[in-house]
Amino acid sequence: NRTLQRAFPHPPMRLREREQVAWLSQTMARELDMDPDLLRFDFQDDALSPAFNVTAVQSKEISALLTLAQTLNVRIAAVTPDACALQRLLPFIPSGRQCLVWRDESQWLWATRYAWGRKSAREATTLHDLAATLSVVPEHISLCAEGEFDPWRAVTVRQPPVPPDGYRFAIALGLAIGEIR
């Protein structure tokens, strides 16, 4: 997992957005013992507490992507970690569920309203193992799988043919939906 998620309490004084960015950059760099210029991050206010939820990555982790985009004259507005894309499907999971999970051969990707992440399949071999590591009741998890949650529910108008094994497209559909505000 090469991204870092942390919550940082708001600073004691009120700051404008540019000052918030500078303050968070310095705070993250100090916490990680890194040069602030080596970090890329995004943040949002925590809805439940006076804090910022920050997602950060080392610049080197995305430098190849940025170089390729520049070569192709593509302007990148945002880089979205794969598990984060699952958050965009949360409004479509059944009532009473609070976590959406997708799995391939090597990893679990998961998202709740306030957090997201990845666990290797070695760390959590079953859905119950994953639920335990996330401190979530298994019955509150929707799994993107055949006979379980179908991410195509998020698409109101579908043109046939819809691919079989639609659950495999959860990340792509989450990215395509974009940010829901």
What does each of the following model-derived ranges do?
Residues N1-R181:
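Hydrophobic/aromatic-enriched cytosolic interaction surfaces used to assemble or bind macromolecules
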